[in-house]
Amino acid sequence: MANIGFYAGSFSPVTRGHLGIVCEALNDYQKVIVGVGINDSKQQLYSLDERCEMINAALDDLLFEYEYRDLVGYRFSRSEEKAVCRLRENRGCVEIVGYRDLTVDCALRSGA
């Protein structure tokens, strides 16, 4: 059985802090599922699809920044370096799923 972590949020928008948590989770789990929730009681700036795309783009940016870290001047922590290496080897170690039901139901469906 795979060791799967689940990280839920609205990610409206995704931040550097969110990516830091994903990186930390990648050091503890074989796979990390990022659950993007829909909360009807909150006014969302971006649609579910846009938020999922933003997370993918942020992960791409993280890989790019790591590749060119000497040029961009961003310092990576050891856990970020480890996580980026995992992402470069296997982008499938992070899966992004949208959901509108209970977080626990999405986590269970995802195998976390």
Positions of PLM-derived features:
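Nucleotidyltransferase catalytic core that binds NTPs
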Residues: 1-112
